[in-house]
A protein has these predicted regions:
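C-terminal all-alpha effector/ligand-binding and dimerization domain
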Residues: 40, 44, 55, 79-157
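Cytosolic histidine kinase catalytic core of two-component systems
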Residues: 31, 71-72
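Short loop-to-helix capping motifs
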Residues: 69-71, 113-114
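Phosphate/oxyanion-binding loops and surfaces in catalytic or ligand/nucleic-acid-binding neighborhoods
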Residues: 23, 67-70, 83, 128
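All-alpha effector-binding/dimerization core of bacterial HTH-type transcriptional repressors
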Residues: 1-63, 101-124
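Conserved catalytic core of Hanks-type protein kinase domains
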Residues: 15, 67, 79
C-alpha cells in the first residue's frame, strides 16, 4: 500500500461508492432487490449480535455492489470495505440501528431506480463515517495499511 493511511481508503470510498450506488439503482433486478431486502431484514434482526450483524451488513453491501451488474464493481466495494474493516472499528448497537435505517433508505432509492438519490445517500453516509472515525480514532486513521490486517471474508486476519 506504499504507506497509505487508512484515511486514504475512506477518501477513495467517497469517490467510488456513490457511483456504485447509482449504478445499483439503475441496474438492480427484482431478484437483486429481494436479496437486498433479505439481507436488510437479517441485519435488523441481528443488531444486538455484532458478529451476526456484521455478516448481514457485509452481505447487504456486497449485494448492492452486485446489483450494479458490473463484476469489477462487485469486487471493488467489498475490497474497499475489507480495507476499512482492517482498522478494527466495531460499531455500537445504537450505531448499528442507525446503519439499518440508512440501509433502508438506500434500498428504497434503489427500488425506485433513483440513481441520484442513491448516490447522495452513500455520499452522506461516507462523509459522516469519515468524520466519525477521524474524530474518534485519529491514530488508527493515520496508521498505514498492512495486508496482514486485511480480511476479505470478514473473519479477521
Amino acid at each position: 500500500f506504499r504507506s497509505a493511511p487508512l484515511s486514504s481508503v475512506l477518501d477513495a470510498r467517497a469517490v467510488i461508492e456513490p457511483s456504485i450506488a447509482a449504478e445499483a439503482a439503475t441496474n438492480a433486478t427484482p431478484e437483486m432487490i429481494a436479496t437486498l431486502r433479505r439481507h436488510l431484514a437479517e441485519a435488523e434482526q441481528r443488531i444486538e449480535d455484532q458478529p451476526a450483524f456484521a455478516a448481514a451488513y457485509r452481505a447487504f453491501w456486497e449485494g448492492v455492489a452486485a446489483a450494479t451488474g458490473n463484476p469489477i464493481l462487485a469486487l471493488l466495494w467489498p475490497a474497499l470495505r475489507a480495507l476499512t474493516d482492517s482498522g478494527g472499528f466495531i460499531p455500537s448497537a445504537d450505531y448499528r440501528t442507525q446503519l439499518v435505517g440508512r440501509m433502508r433508505v438506500l434500498l428504497a432509492a434503489i427500488e425506485a431506480g433513483d440513481a441520484a438519490e442513491a448516490a447522495a445517500i452513500i455520499a452522506a453516509l461516507d462523509s459522516e463515517f469519515a468524520r466519525r472515525l477521524t474524530a474518534s480514532y485519529p491514530e488508527r486513521m493515520a496508521r498505514p495499511l498492512a495486508w496482514s490486517e486485511v480480511s476479505i471474508d470478514g473473519e479477521g486476519p
